[in-house]
Amino acid sequence: MAVDVRTQIEVGRPRDEVAAFAADPDNAPRWYANIKSVTWKSPRPLAVGSQIEFAAEFLGRRLVYTYEVKELVPGERFVMATAEGPFPMRTTYTWADAARGGTTMELRNEGQPSGFKSIAAPFVKLAMKRENRKDLRRLKELLESS
């Protein structure tokens, strides 16, 4: 069973500011509760083809995986994907102008778990949606308080 989770939030900051912060992998541990560290596997700056290793904890397990940037349109869209492990994942961020100079950000995670993980896909989907909501709220708090 495929997992496809979309979560949105409106942030009271300009789109270019929200996108620049969210698309910078070095900021991920600041707003993703489960991401503990980020290691660049390719030289900066961020570009299509860049590889970034994330160490995370999700559902009580430590996960280390390398994402590759697949698409980068500053201020509009950022796509990265990993083919590693039992749960290959594609993560997409999109940003659009919202009312009063704010930004609507959508976080989408798509994956196709294999083996035992495929049986747990409905549970994983619910947990992922819950965590994504928390993460986007944290991103909003960080950006609106600065």
PLM features: residue spans?
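Hydrophobic ligand-binding cavity/cleft-lining segments
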Residues: 1-47, 144
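Short, charged/polar surface micro-motifs in flexible loops or helix N-caps
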Residues: 59-62, 71-77, 86
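Short beta-strand segments that buttress and anchor functional surface loops
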Residues: 51-57, 78-84
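Beta-strand/loop substructures that line and gate deep hydrophobic ligand-binding cavities in soluble
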Residues: 79-134, 139
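Short, surface-exposed coil-to-beta transition loops
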Residues: 4-6, 62-66, 88-92
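Beta-strand elements of well-folded, non-transmembrane domains
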Residues: 11, 58-60, 111-115
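A short, structured loop/turn motif at beta-sheet edges
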Residues: 15-16, 43-46, 70-75, 94-104, ...
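Generic structural detector for well-ordered beta-strands
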Residues: 8-12, 39, 55, 68, ...
